[in-house]
């Protein structure tokens, strides 16, 4: 899939149901495809039955290389969305983010593409992945857009990272790029 996906605009895969006793696909399959294909991956959670994906989009923004890659990859979807929101967490801890202007950079970038966004107030939470998923549910989000593995996978494995949490627990489809 990773090799064939390199010549695709978007790879769409389902996430393994971790409650299955003998899953057909390895639990880390979405992660593997994202890390090795060089293409955006749309991951659909098990049991997702809503009629829409991409009408109400939430971008998890931290000004990283992975984050802008995901946003750029999502532009065709964002142009058709009814609502695009940008959320940032712990902006005071991000070396590449000016806390006073947080979100204005990505809002301007998207405006150049004709996409109107709502920049949510910066959030503070030490469990970003869990907080992001909860906020997504509160906002009736039907697509999360985020960069995957801004830190090394080893660090995420040790500390429990946003990517790992979202990949493992999201009930909302996720578009990720690395």
Regions found by a protein language model. Name each.
Residues 2, 54-55, 70, 95-100, ...:
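Short, well-ordered secondary-structure micro-motifs
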Residues 1-11, 112-144, 150-157, 172:
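Structural beta-alpha unit
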Residues 31, 72, 108, 133, ...:
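Active-site phosphate/pyrophosphate- and oxyanion-stabilizing loops and adjacent acidic/basic residues
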Residues 26-29, 100-104, 135, 158-163:
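Charged helix-capping and loop-helix junction motifs
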Residues 88, 121, 147-148, 176-178:
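Active-site proximal loops enriched in glycine and acidic residues that flank catalytic Cys/His/Asp
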Residues 84-113, 134:
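Acidic, proline/glycine-rich short linear motifs
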Residues 1-87, 168-178:
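Intrinsically disordered or low-complexity boundary/linker segments at protein termini
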Residues 19-20, 92-97, 124-126, 152-153:
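Short, small-residue-enriched loops and turns at beta-alpha junctions
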